[in-house]
Each structure stands twice: as C-alpha cells, then as structure tokens.
C-alpha cells in the first residue's frame, strides 16, 4: 500500500473543510463519473450525511460504513487486529487500512476514511481530543493527513 501525505491547507493557511466545498467537489465527481465510498469512525456518519444531502449523489456514492468500535473496523472493513493493537484505532495506519480495504471491497474509485478522538473525553497525552486522521484512497494510492483540532465535539466531527 503506497502511502503519501495530502495537504489540506489553503493558501490562507486555514484548513479547508468539506462543508464549504462539497457542492463543487460533488459536481466534479459527477461530471467525471467518479464513484466514492466512505468509512467513518469519529465523524459517526456525518461525512456520508453531508455527501448524500447533495443532489445527484446517488449516481456516484456507493456505500458508507460507520465503524465506531474496533470490532466493527475488523468485521466490516477488515482492519487488521494486530494493527489496531500495535497503533490503536486513532492512527495513520488504521485510517490507511480503512480507506484501502474499503476501496477493495466497494471497487469505488475514491474512498474516504476518518478516525480520531472527537471528545469531549477519551483523549490521552499521546492522542488528545481533537486528533483526527483523514484518509483518501485513489487508484490504490493512499493519502492520510493528521489534523489537530482545538474545538467542540460538533466542530471536530464535521
């Protein structure tokens, strides 16, 4: 599995959120007939909800999984138990496996994955509340970005 970093930083050095660009992104995907699927943990289905609120999305959106527990990640997305044990659910490695395995399972051209500590509790010194990994898999290339938010639960999830 090739791994690359994908920059989510705008020219104004602010993070770009899907909320502000989803209609243009969806239109591009529709115009180019690019199929997509999602695998979410900390976002709890909010990414899928945002995507499916867009007109015409049914033409390209194939599937969405909410795998909040480790067991769900193993069962539904075939995340390796040893990877979960070694790195934990909130890790670049798990995010990568979620995304890559989803692409193999759904045959979608682009897959997205999220895992993180949304809060308000549950964080540790090494993995604090607000630590999120976002993955994108395209043509078997995996891009995972680590994000660190300092905000409320609803902001972290979206």
Stretches found by the model and what they are:
Residues 8-158:
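Short alpha-helical segments enriched in small residues
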